[in-house]
């Protein structure tokens, strides 16, 4: 059996009372039936898999434990995590006591998608969109130059509708929203993350005050990208207009651009772009003009980084289940929750519940047969 300290061969005795057979050594060591890898070892493999490619994990295990494993072993650890994630979700739904709802003055929600290369997607579209929502209650200074998000929780799903459901479910079960609560949302206004989506969230939560922001990084990026074929001064003027929240100045920039356009198709594209920017200009309004701090707003790109760093380098391709499982593993590891998933007390409670439900199922089946 391979443990976290190396590979060991040993023999043990089975104990029986005539009705039940048990192996105390296996139980004490936490070994599962027919498995040659300990749970502790699988935990370490899964942890390493969140940081590096599967083949690299094999090399690290070989150099540290002098134990040779294949990438299939790493895959087995990841699939074991997938199984635990599903069990934890069922455990939460059926058994776990609902947490005490926290009363907050400000609740921050941001959403965006991450495009991941997939082996399961259609030939003409080799990317899958991973939905990512982040919920937190503000930003706190923890050192001279570092701030930390408070009560951060991340939701990652390939199914957009399920992600939205999980978002609302998490907020409803963990936060007490009243008339004094301010819902602060931020997005790039892309498909699935428009102001309307977050307004629906606010309506479902029955908040009295909701402030939505069009992520300033994406606004400047869009303006810079669109205006780069025109004189550089126009890009500077547009950036200044956004910074000072001056719609008149921005309209002046657009009027100048319009006068430089000669092609009809280009004009149609420009009118579409101009309409989107001006119609949503109110969401560009800076936080200080809304009597809010900008701390904790616009954090999505930094939250994406841990996912993209592991899953988008060197042209990696992922299966559907692999995208979802690895993304959630990374989130758990960064939040120091991966070990709790493997060894938390919930596993024993869930195991007892599962055994009880199976016993009840067999009893009902036997009763039906007798009837």
Language model region names:
Residues 1-18:
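Structured, non-catalytic alpha/beta "coupling" segments that mediate domain-domain communication
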Residues 15-371:
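Catalytic center-proximal scaffold of phosphoryl-transfer enzymes
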